[in-house]
Amino acid sequence: MISPPWLPVPPPAYGGTEAVVDGIVRGLQRAGHDVVVAAHPDSDTPAEIRSFLPRRTTGTIGQGATELAHVVEAYESLHDVDVIHDHTLAGPLIGPGCRGVPPVVATHHGTFDDACKRIFRRAGRWTQLVAISQSQAASAGDVPIAAVVHHGVDVADFPFEETGGDYLVFLGRMVPEKGAHHAIHIARRVGMPLRLAAKMREEPERAFFEAEVEPLLGGDAEYVGELGGRDKLDLLAGARALLNPIDWAEPFGMVMLESLACGTPVVGRSLGAAPEIVGHGQVGFLGRTDAELAAALERVDDIDRLACRTWAAQRFSLELMAKGYEEQYLLATEDPRAA
């Protein structure tokens, strides 16, 4: 397993890809596999950890040379495994060119913009490419997608409250497409208090917060910082609903799944993978406009919170995710390109 080098596995706070990698590791181990993970040196996932970069060089997402160094050393180190599962952007393109590399399965966690299409169109010649949602796969164009494997969680890791509190919660990055500013307007429209927990480490995130979000805060809309671990889950479990007014075709949306695992209904835009995760009228409501989301919030107490948790357990378990990837690992080892 090759994780990006920027954050530990699992991440201490925000870090969707790293949380998914941790889940895959645990699911595979339950299925009886031995797992090696190339990752950030502070990683604590239950597997053999191999790290190739000192701590001081990691932590700033997007430094190309840092990721390249991590990827090359990871591939050169992993000659003793049966198959490599790569979660980086650079790895699927350059890693298989290293001598003696095992078969490669690659998962793309982002959008298929033009640059990523060019990368994965070429990488697909020698790797099994996996999409994380039908929506993401549909956006890939002529990129050769081998399969779709949804993310999974273990609901036993998530707290559950039969009756939610009186507040709504927003969780995500502090960027325009995640919609924190929309969340405040929608919550205020129906008179429901809102708590916002969001990643705000990079300069563009801080600039957006100061310009578009901070002026809207007040007694009914509170920014509580970036939360991780139990603090994040307790906030989710105690909420009346997760408000997710995204402005983009999100490839998956892990926060929606985490919310359902806590038994908290989701009210959000019907964009990207949201319809694959949220059963409209069953575990939440999806709409297109702020007015539609506001109207949905008026009905959110009709949603059975236990049904939300059961939905996550039955449709998005670690076991289902691990099984999906096991199938791709087997296909990769049988592929004549791996010979």
Kindly give the residue locations of the regions a language model identified.
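Catalytic cores of nucleotide-sugar-dependent glycosyltransferases that transfer UDP/GDP/TDP-activated
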Residues: 1-339
